């Protein structure tokens, strides 16, 4: 179950990326049971993913607590650019931790923090990764499936409200 803080960060990430030429989707399930081993061998979910009209794919992993950050849930950094989004106080707790710094370096991850004024701020830029055509295709298909899932939920909600 998502905490209120996680929901807030997710919504603010959506608001910050909701621009002309950028499409976003939350909880993107990567691949299917047949393709999960293509990238990592594990079932992957990206908390929030955007795709630009130029085909650039950005992945955002949202963590709202130390337990969340250290949980067994995978951090899926599969896009051209990848960001870890977390509250500023959590970032301050882990900013000098060796395990955290190694994770940032190994994946060239950017850091976005939620400040006390309820604004997101880019603290650390990420390096752009080159993705193979196969990886890009898998991510685009996953994005489309997840967006269709969300559209289906809206259709169901509309029909429920019309009755």
For each feature predicted by the language model, list its residue ranges.
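Residue-level detector of short, conserved catalytic/binding motifs and their immediate flanks
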Residues: 46, 80, 109
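Non-catalytic C-terminal interaction segments of nucleic acid-processing enzymes
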Residues: 1-21, 33, 95-163
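Active-site beta-strand-loop-beta-strand hairpin of nuclease catalytic cores
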Residues: 41-59, 68, 74-77
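Surface-exposed, flexible loop/turn segments at secondary-structure boundaries
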Residues: 32, 56, 67-68, 90, ...
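Anionic group-transfer/hydrolysis microenvironments
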Residues: 29, 49, 63
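A short acidic/basic microdomain associated with nuclease active sites
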Residues: 18-40
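Short, charged, amphipathic alpha-helix that recurs within catalytic cores of restriction-modification
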Residues: 65-104
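Short, hydrophobic beta-strand segments that form beta-sheet elements in well-ordered domains
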Residues: 58-64, 82-86, 110-113
């Amino acid at each position: 179950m998502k905490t209120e803080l996680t929901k807030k960060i997710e919504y603010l990430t959506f608001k910050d990326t909701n621009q002309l030429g950028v499409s976003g989707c939350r909880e993107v399930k990567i691949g299917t049971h047949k393709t999960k081993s293509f990238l990592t061998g594990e079932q992957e979910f990206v908390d929030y993913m955007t795709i630009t009209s130029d085909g650039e794919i950005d992945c955002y992993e949202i963590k709202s607590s130390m337990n969340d950050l250290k949980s067994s849930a995978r951090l899926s950094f599969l896009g051209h650019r990848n960001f870890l989004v977390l509250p500023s106080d959590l970032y301050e707790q882990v900013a000098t931790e060796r395990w955290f710094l190694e994770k940032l370096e190994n994946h060239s991850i950017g850091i976005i923090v939620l400040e006390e004024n309820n604004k997101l701020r880019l603290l650390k830029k990420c390096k752009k990764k080159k993705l193979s055509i196969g990886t890009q295709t898998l991510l685009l298909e996953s994005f489309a499936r997840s967006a269709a899932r969300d559209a289906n939920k809206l259709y169901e909600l509309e029909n429920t409200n019309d009755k």
